[in-house]
Amino acid sequence: MSLVILNWNGREFLDTCLDSLERLDYPEDQLELVLCDNGSMDGSVEHVRTRHPKFRIVALDRNHGFAEGNNVGAKKAAGEWVGFLNNDMEVPADWLERLLTPLDTRPDLACLASRIVSWDGGTIDFIGGGLNFQGHGLQLDHDAPSSPQDVARPLLFACGGAMLVRRRLFLDVGGFDPAYFAFFEDVDLGWRLNLLGHDVWYEPAATVRHRHHGTARRIPPHQLRVLSERNALYTIIKNYDDANLALVLPAALMLLNEKALLMAGVDPARFRVDGAPAPATPPPQPRTGRPDALARVRQRGLAGAGQAALRRAHRAAAALTNTPEPVVTPAAPGGGMPDTALSLLVAISETAHGMDALMQKRAWVQSRRRRSDAEVLGLGGVLLEDPTFGHAGYLDFQHWLARVAGIDAAFESVKL
């Protein structure tokens, strides 16, 4: 067993995390502890070398991101299983033994997901996830004190901040896609594993505490937005079957454009030739597809499908990306677009420039597919709401577009 803790300038969190791992009730001669450092400048490596000599240190020359940093750690590790833990986690002594318990009855499982709670232990952080149709990952019942979904079951994906996976399989299927850098690489990995016929399992008895996004707060919000939106596109391009991708990708691109215009406060009428007909304005749309869709969810910060829950969702998503709730300020003629709006266009551009590699990855996954989209997406569910932008007019447009494009009907059986 190898446990990899990825670190980037997180010295302030390390002692709590590493001390807890050193106290694990697990045979020392069967446990390899690895700190993979992403070029930290805060003395993290020197501190761990002195304070935590049990840890093998893999020191990288620069920040390779969450995805590739963990990939390097997995390649350097020696265990049959490799675990990934965020540096702002704390685990109880029995965490690892409990996480491995499902293998007693399901020895074929490929990946094991932990139960993650808030730092004070009072609310849910991760008990399973789904996604919205545009590819943004969701955490079910986030911030709730309890949940009926908090039971052992197969998942669409494990949270990359506290999971185990068979190391050889992880490497053979490509690991975390290094092109993601960070955000949704765990969603992509879980979707890929499931498509290839491998099971991801949630074990509620294996609980860890999470300080929550200590590293992400150091990254400017417009840069985080590029990662979030671009990686969502990467995920759907690689993993949807042909029919679903043909429905979703055009809509996802149109919605990114709509969101950018709203973020920038652009008035489309200013660009319309006098006398030209204005496009129709979609009428207000219902926010949920079914009465049972009111379960809280979060986009690695989203809460909810109902209106109150959805408002909480956007506050949570804003906290994740260090950005305020949606505020639309009219753009002056000739004025520049704000970076948060431009970040969506950059996400589209980076996706376009990466299409050659994306299509090769898609071909690899689709040629090895063993399960249908309905089977896989049903493990977490698909939300129609966008977890990243709570503008009421935008959500009306999104629901209208999903309906007229046939997306709503296509995902009826798995809709949150």
PLM feature spans:
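A conserved acidic beta->alpha catalytic loop
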Residues: S20, P27, D37-E46, R62
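Glycine-rich, basic loop-to-helix element that forms the pyrophosphate-binding segment
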Residues: A59-A77, N87-M89, R98
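Short aromatic/hydrophobic "clamp" motif used to bind/position activated sugar donors
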Residues: V82
